[in-house]
Amino acid sequence: MCDPDRPWTRREFLKLAGQAGLLSTVPTLASASAALNPDTVCISILHTTDLHGHILPTSDYDGNRDRGGLARCATQIRRWQRENPNSILIDVGDVYQGTDVSLRNKGALMIDLLNQLEYDAWVVGNHEFDWGMECFERALEQSNMPVLAANTLMEGKPAGEFPDAKHPFAKIQSFILKEIAGIKLAIIGVTTPGMPFWLWPEFTRGLDFRNPVEPVRRAIASAKKGGANAIVLTGHMGLKTRTGGDDFANTVMALTSEFPEVAVFIAGHTHQDVPSRLTNGVLFTQADHFGIHVGRVDLLFDRNSKKLLRRDAMCELMDKHFAFDGAVISRAKSQLAESEEALASPIGELAETLRSRSEPGRPSNLEKLIGAAIMETLSERNVPVDGVMHGSFGDTAELVAGPKSVRDVWNVIPFENYIVTAQLSPEEIKISMDEVFATHENRNLLGFAVKTEGRGGKGKIVSMTLANGEPLDRNKKYVIALNSFDARSGGHHFMKLRVFLERPEAHCTLHPVQTRDALIGYFQRHKVVRRIAAIRPLASAA
């Protein structure tokens, strides 16, 4: 048997593909080898991840426009399926949250498109729960294909063992076993175990997300018992951007180290383009986000022995060279038009451009605006607060002066985070904000006058008063508003804050209003919005 990971030279590849007459159509050596040798079979696994409701093109993180979207991915997926009918199609999670068109139908359009494209499975992602359990359960019910999350307990039952076959949870499985051209291929799916550090508990009611190592061990045993000739692991998790290692939400290194027999790990969650690399001897690949890349894995097997001979992976950039799939556009056309009209709706005017760059203790003008909108929205609901902790989602975000539309607010606040209030002492507020400043996360405290010393992760609060200069009473509690994501630790960043909020005396409360809607409403009420000099508290201390 040939080494499945031996690097081939360009000359060897061109020679082999040329002999097969497939230079213009076959992307990998495994495909070329199968075309040339009838004693081998190539199975292709086509994959998308982190689509986040994007049907049409968007911009990438470098500002390049006209990239991605499921409509383009579908064009390439169909092309690859024509090239190799021995194909499996999967999505690795975060399917529907992220666009207005998807929010309007609570993800139903995206699941419908997965059904129409005949995906074989999709993996549960963390953003599947941003709109609550009812939306997630409807997505399960609507799916024609299994949904994978081997490391999830549903009311205490492992994936694939939920007793009520009519309940949506019964759709969640540990793996699928597909027989193609005589080869049995198991695809095991896991989700990130980091859910509790992002999501309000009510949004994942009845579900428990475990470290995936032992669930994967059980799934591999079951798959092998079912006759699997090869194991593919796919997970809504990736490698950490800076270190390439694991953390509370990503366990790729642990899984590939524990299960080196896995043929390939198809990743997601971290929004990275990783065409092909070896991780602990396991082929690793990840197809970016928003459909900006679509991925393909080719596994070459010997037909008789059913042994894996070679494995290749690649990702294709979905730019202007790829047309939109007609069926996808036709099916989504009316809802896309409805969304476009809503996004273009005017909400008011901004008198001057507001930028997001800030320093610890020195909130940006954009942060001040968001804080004022949250504070005023809560006041209208008879929930006065003393301050707001919030950020502006990056240093480059800005609101440009002029007429504003709903789309402008979406660009500033892309997530459906709810508003949370809690009662904290001055000491708890100081400890929490010192922790926030140490993380390099863009957050500030609005409604208070905060003085700091040091820069970056070394910034510390040296004094804090109310915005009018009045000193804080250490024996009183102050009502602070923040978003639901930060209230759960902001992705493991604000663990001290989380501990304070979980104490009964904090009276931590989730309010049924989202931060984006608060900012839209602020524009609609004020008509012309001007730069905010300072935010004044709308409450007395508790």
Where are these regions (language model features)?
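Acidic, metal/ion-coordinating pockets
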Residues: 2-321, 365-376, 388, 423-424, ...
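Catalytic centers of hydrolytic enzymes
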Residues: 39-63, 68-78, 82, 198, ...
